[in-house]
């Protein structure tokens, strides 16, 4: 009896083990055939979903065993079984779209959650190799599919027998892709094999791209080419297969997985980098092993290059773009001692120690400074062929990676120091530099600084745009210092930084002066870009008051400008945030935008980030809030995050404060606001065009801040609007300094260009313009500042004209203040911006929130007319008014008076100190703001969630109730997940139902029903007189209004606090909106919706203005 029971238990355990282990090749094929190539999993309960019943593709709604079917009311996901992938319901508050449109015949499933790695899943055909996983070779598909669960490779005998027929008559036509197994096999399926006991962990398998499906052969020793096979005549179908494989080969394997990122789990010691293909870049600066040994990525790269030199290259075109890039990478990354004696392959150009020494010398001056600036590094995985998501990030895709050719990588070129002085934009990527000319360039490096050929370069106020030639692989190219330049530039006569005398020599400049002009890192040095430098010399004698004013402007700019150390800290913080966000949005890109990178920032500037999750327009009212809610919930478990605020402005942002040592940096994160990336790209070129642009902007922004006219919450200018005003003055003022880049380079600065192809390091071709260089270069900084104040105080007609840097001139207000059409996909409306893009970017560029409440939109005719009321500053890409926050006539008159007073003061005494010693304008205005959802952490931080609660955590954030904080404004309070499956009861305040379909209600739109109102705390207890927002973290009705505090402890450990920021919107309050949610004895008293407890009604004489707190900038 006991034996029978034991035997039955053993059989049950074997069956359980068989179902949960990684599927073998046969089981994978069987699952693919029966279920269309897909295995479905229950992501909530974190267990394999009906693996034994692959035909069952529907999900049960009972018992929390799977995602529910499509339900438009609760915005849940739906699965698309016909296409073989899952698509998400793009409605309202749902898990944001991660459409996995994979073909059903590839045997793959949607991308798994990064923390949910215990599912045996099949990856797409063109997948990156994850070194912590073990491959499973599917002989019927012709490529390796990978499983998250560790499993041993098939036995060598099985591989050789299964592929002997397919590889016997064909020679490799392309470089093989190495797959190294570093650990002996331990799978139960192979323990009985004769070859398993003697399996050599160093056996390497390689697959040639030209082999037949399943063409894997065993190499007897590492990195040795198998004996050549006799050639055969392939059929027409084989030729088509080979041609397709040849086209796909450079992109067949994507970048390494997120495990390579900084600060991630240490890499296993048994895993080496030999699996990386020749066209991949190094992932990180530091890689750790299990022995806690710190190994530089340069050393690992050198090892990889040494091993890669033994790759078979008989039938490889040495001029292939991938190998052209390989030559540059080999030169930049490092030289291994093994390369000095081994025979060099086409990918290794270093021939002797002299070249190696030259390359190492260049590495000390030119680091990898291009790709990680605006976006995350190229080692983050990206999807490949999804229409509604980001494509795989390749070199050039993300700003500021160079080149749109995806096979080329964005490394800087070797240029002389004189080229860096001549133009801050003169950098090329690796494809533009011939490795053979590098030693010659490096030998001339010192001569270029002190040589007679460059005596006019350092002390010359030359323009920042030079002609460049389009690179071509395999052809002879000229170095940057040999490219044609516009000659006969006159030296600037700006006496504050006047030119060097004829007797002066560039060699006389001391080292400290050269350090300021020639940063060791052109892109990162100093200000994110190498700031355009004026001529370097002492002031001319005798000095005038204008000279002193110009010198003070320049000194102030150098004092407040963003330093290189601050930029590095911001970039490191960006990497930390992306590491935390990528598990939730693994197919996204995180861009640095705004003043931190466009050249106009300082050390106190916030860092603005843009999370791009799709290349389509995103509804900023609804979908963007959902995305930011997910990020807020994710970051609450990160210890380096101190607090978060979700600001529901016109462009919603998530304001993040950090713990030490990053407590002095504030991050404003927005979702899919691509216009911020385009603006950053455009302003980068304007700021680098002439050396006088940045100092002038720095002084104007500081003066406006001290004068109190640089705050959108107080009906004044934003920093972005001030920058556009300075650029417009330099384009249309008495002395023209800047051209119109959008007209001169329409293909470069167009709103149709994909933001992932934007590049801020490529030089622009020289074009003809109407700028008088002789007059422009004589104008000093002091004269430009006085002219700027005079232009906007006396010359500019605010009633008739509008500012437009897109057209490079003053335009009539009537031409711009035309109500645009609602966004359409028709051919005639391609240029019309969508509603989500027409929002002001003030919250992106200066951390502020737009002054007009978010419920206003272009669909409201009154708002569209009112936003052009006072001053019109056209946004260069969306054609909206960036100064729409200035709607108060009294404040606008005070602003114009401030310009007149400043101009008179500076024109009279030329004293910058007195200009800065000004008092704020005296104009009373109601404070404007947006709803704020603040999340602070008190006590112990919530524990990190287990993998089986990841899906539930996302749903908990999605099912948050908006609580009214003013007419048309809502902030969110998390609630229990129990309301998902319960019916909606009148007055229970459990749902997310509103009469209007947009999710937000404006003053003139449909009103809430009383039973659906979010302002009604408890309609089941109407006698309490409470009108404040109801805290619905549980299903109990709050009967005592005194229990409503400013912060309520949530079930997840997050304290949610309300700020009365949006209690005053600056617009008349709709009486119907206030009275619809309140019942009195026939007497309806006007009251702010943000009142938390009942209070006596006030008479008209006792009414006081509604108080509000400022949104911290």
From Swiss-Prot:
Pfam family, one: PAP_assoc
Biological process annotations from GO: cytosolic mRNA polyadenylation; embryo development ending in birth or egg hatching; meiotic cell cycle; mRNA processing; nucleus organization; positive regulation of meiosis I; positive regulation of mitotic nuclear division; regulation of cell division
Positions that bind Mg(2+): 606, 608
Entry EC number(s): 2.7.7.19
Polar residues: compositionally biased ranges: 60-106, 972-994
Keywords of the record: ATP-binding, Cytoplasm, Developmental protein, Magnesium, Manganese, Meiosis, Metal-binding, mRNA processing, Nucleotide-binding, Transferase
Composition bias type Pro residues, residue spans: 223-233
Intracellular or extracellular location(s): Cytoplasm
InterPro entries per record: MTPAP-like_central (IPR054708), NT_sf (IPR043519), PAP_assoc (IPR002058)
Function: Cytoplasmic poly(A) RNA polymerase that adds successive AMP monomers to the 3'-end of specific RNAs, forming a poly(A) tail. Acts as a regulator of mitosis/meiosis required for progression through meiotic prophase during oogenesis and spermatogenesis and for promotion of the entry into meiosis from the mitotic cell cycle. May act by regulating and activating gld-1 mRNA activity in germline. Required for polyadenylation of neg-1 mRNA during embryogenesis.
Subunit structure of this chain's protein: Interacts with gld-3.
Protein name in the entry: Poly(A) RNA polymerase gld-2
Gene name per UniProt: gld-2
